Swiss-Prot record:
Residues 1-52 are annotated as: Disordered. This is Putative uncharacterized protein YNL338W. Residues 35-45 have a biased composition (Basic residues). Completely overlaps TEL14L-XC, a telomeric X element core sequence on the left arm of chromosome XIV. It comes from Saccharomyces cerevisiae (strain ATCC 204508 / S288c) (Baker's yeast).
C-alpha cells in the first residue's frame, strides 16, 4: 500500500497518459474515413468552407 501511493503521482500519471493515448483512437478513426473517399475528396477540394 505504501508503494502504491508513492508511485501514484509519478508512475500512475505517466501510465494514465500512456493508456488513453490517441494511438488507439487514431487507429479506429483511420479505418472509418478510409472506406469513405467522399470525406477525403471534400476535404481536399474544400469547395465549401462553410461545410467544414
Amino acid at each position: 500500500m505504501s508503494l502504491r501511493p508513492c508511485l501514484t503521482p509519478s508512475s500512475m500519471q505517466y501510465s494514465d497518459i500512456y493508456i488513453p493515448t490517441p494511438t488507439p483512437t487514431h487507429h479506429t478513426h483511420t479505418p472509418t474515413p478510409h472506406p469513405h473517399p467522399h470525406t477525403h475528396t471534400h476535404t481536399h477540394h474544400n469547395p465549401n468552407p462553410t461545410l467544414f
